A protein has these predicted regions:
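Non-catalytic cap/lid and distal C-terminal segments of serine-dependent acyl enzymes
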Residues: 1-251
Length: 251
């Protein structure tokens, strides 16, 4: 499998940002894979997630790009100034959609977003904010309420990064609703150790999508399924097989 590690200067963040790329630029689908909370661009590779996707990468079905994160300065910095934190988060959002994504974008095609834990939070935010850019979302052990991280603080940017707040207020005939209904949306969460908050967060979004008539797949795994890499390593290829079936050679 082709892999490369790169860095680029982000005008949005005024700093260098690193990322990993796995697979060929001619692959059918681009997938942005976000790291877990406070994680780095190499985590998806180092914890074996890229390896579980090798059959799809090698078959030319998928190219995975792993951005770097700044959660420690934004979502996780609960003692920091909330306005500064969410404004910095918005600058990171623009780094992803305006700087990182365009060189990899396929002509006439949209990308996929995925992630586990905080990566699943990011996947949800990018997908629901920009269904004009993304038409597949796989969130493993994510949640979708910005106030989980910002508590009593709310402004227009926290709202924009909180699908459980803005989706209920979106009119049924909003143009984004049509794009959501044309997309593939997968939510997955375990019911075991350390998944309690994520389970509630998945239920919350599941109910909103159902009420809005947005097709989706909410998959609740067993009570032995914990918030851990060993389970995400099982979930990722399981869902890739549903999204990108690989034909088996007969005989």
């Amino acid at each position: 499998m082709k892999e490369r590690w790169e860095k680029t200067f982000s005008q949005a963040l005024d700093r260098e940002m690193e990322f990993g790329v796995f697979g060929d630029d001619t692959a059918e689908k681009l997938c942005l894979a976000f790291p877990p909370q406070n994680g780095r661009f190499y985590d998806f590779h180092n914890f074996g997630m890229v390896e579980t996707a090798a059959p799809w990468i090698e078959a030319g079905k998928l190219q995975i790009v792993c951005p770097d994160g700044i959660d420690g300065e934004t979502w996780s910095d609960e003692n920091g100034d909330p306005q500064y934190r969410i404004e910095l988060q918005e600058r990171w959002y623009h780094h992803i959609v305006d700087e990182l994504l365009p060189p990899f974008a396929r002509a006439g095609g949209k990308a996929m977003v995925c992630g586990c834990s905080m990566g699943g939070v990011h996947a949800g935010n990018f997908f629901f904010r920009r269904p004009d850019l993304f038409d597949m979302m796989l969130s493993m052990s994510g949640l979708f309420n910005g106030q989980y991280f910002f508590h009593d603080y709310m402004d227009d940017l926290v709202y924009a990064n909180s699908p459980v707040h803005f989706l209920p207020n979106m009119p049924y005939d909003h143009p984004w609703m049509t794009l959501y209904r044309q997309s593939r949306i997968i939510l997955c969460v375990g019911q075991g150790a350390w998944e309690e908050d994520l389970l509630h967060g998945t239920w919350e979004l599941d109910a909103i999508l159902t009420a809005k008539g947005i097709p989706h797949w909410a998959d609740y795994w067993g009570f032995d399924v914990a918030h851990d890499w060993c389970w995400w390593q099982k979930q990722f290829p399981y869902f890739l097989e549903h999204l990108f079936p690989i034909e088996q050679n007969a005989g």
